[in-house]
């Protein structure tokens, strides 16, 4: 086999390389952010033009994708030690780390001004706060403290508030209720992840909640935060953001998830936590469908 043939076989194919660049943005997470941002717009009082709405949602996704790319850059050595992440583009060597760094810096420099023009300055500022909190605070904090759980929930809860402020131009009770709902939802969701991936996180040297506080304490916190999620989801009703159908749906979902969380306090092993994690995804999906239908 000639050198040229070997190089041809090992050279990255354009479509595969493009796919890896997209993977840096963690597209499933970015897609969820687009949905929650659009949900904030849908629920907000007032109107925003279709073109401005599309630009706002897309620019929000770009900022989130950039934050994820920077996270991949900063955690590339950690990802290489973890089974779940070692095949990501950077630890696998398919993308140069400085490409991820460049995209992570250039993309928000382009998208945040667009948010300011398509929506308003407040929405752009919220995007910047989410980006900086995720990259400069949450990402390094995961290596030092389990309280990173609560810090990381802040940027994750900002997108629906951005959708709200893009329409209203201000932060009020409705926007804060949406922020509170997403903040509360993330706590049991990520506690479950820290539990069923505890060994992998320990392998990577990350001080996630279950790795630091142990399995029983994590299950207790999962039950507590799931119970607190119920009033957070129902808070939208007295504010006039949702009707009776949503209230019934939120109550049933919240009680069912709380019962399952409580049932896991005395259990052991990661299978239950994995099932609970999937349950939180179903919970949020059905909740947002009910929200959309209630308007």
Curated annotation (Swiss-Prot):
GO terms for cellular component: plasma membrane. The chain crosses the membrane at residues 31-51, 54-74, 98-118, 121-141, 147-167, 173-193, 220-240, 245-265, 273-293. Keywords: Cell inner membrane, Cell membrane, Heme biosynthesis, Membrane, Transferase, Transmembrane, Transmembrane helix. It is an enzyme of class 2 (transferase). It is found in: Cell inner membrane. It comes from the Bacteria. Converts heme B (protoheme IX) to heme O by substitution of the vinyl group on carbon 2 of heme B porphyrin ring with a hydroxyethyl farnesyl side group. This is Protoheme IX farnesyltransferase. It comes from Anaeromyxobacter dehalogenans (strain 2CP-C).
